[in-house]
């Protein structure tokens, strides 16, 4: 049986790169400062935009911007420790431009920094948290990724590891 797809849409963290230790360190510090009641390492939080998690955990609108800026700062400081998952460099370097992209829940700077730290190319069609109104589990990131590649969503395959991303891909 053969399967054909026009476009390949990859999540980044956990699919192409391993940033778990760096993210865990950043979120542990952030939670100790802003939300000590939160167990950030719970898998249900994986794959979602930091801004959405901060909004969920910080009830004060006045504190949201400060808290959101802080997690962005902490994650950026640890991005350089990101490594490529086995086979990711060979895979992405073998794909033709315009046939694949990354749809990440990270902000633009963090998404690029993690890809570059891992030695992976940054696709021109990169989709980040800032590009969509609704992040995963909503389908917006993957719909935009397909659109940027010029393909119908049903002609694309999504590679995803987090339940929020799988829900986005299936929506």
Residue ranges and their predicted role:
Residues 101, 107-157, 163-170:
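Substrate-recognition "cap/lid" segment bordering the active-site pocket of phosphatases
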Residues 10, 159-160:
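Active-site flanking residues adjacent to catalytic metal/cofactor-binding acidic residues
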Residues 82-86, 136, 160:
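Conserved phosphate-coordination/catalytic loops
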Residues 2-96, 107-109, 120:
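N-terminal helical cap/lid subdomain that shapes the substrate entry/recognition surface
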């Amino acid at each position: 049986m053969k399967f054909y797809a026009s476009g390949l849409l990859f999540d980044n963290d956990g699919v192409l790169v391993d940033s778990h230790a760096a993210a865990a360190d950043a979120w542990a510090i952030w939670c100790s400062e802003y939300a000590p009641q939160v167990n950030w390492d719970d898998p249900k939080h994986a794959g979602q935009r930091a801004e959405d998690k901060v909004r969920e955990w910080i009830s004060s609108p006045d504190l949201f911007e400060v808290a959101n800026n802080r997690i962005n700062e902490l994650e950026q400081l640890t991005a350089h420790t990101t490594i490529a998952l086995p086979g990711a460099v060979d895979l992405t370097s073998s794909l033709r431009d315009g046939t694949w992209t990354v749809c990440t829940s990270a902000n633009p700077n963090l998404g690029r920094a993690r890809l570059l730290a891992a030695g992976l190319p940054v696709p021109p069609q990169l989709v980040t948290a800032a590009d969509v109104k609704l992040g995963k589990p909503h389908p917006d990131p993957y719909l935009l990724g397909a659109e940027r590649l010029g393909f119908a969503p049903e002609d694309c395959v999504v590679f995803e590891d987090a339940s929020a991303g799988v829900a986005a891909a299936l929506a």
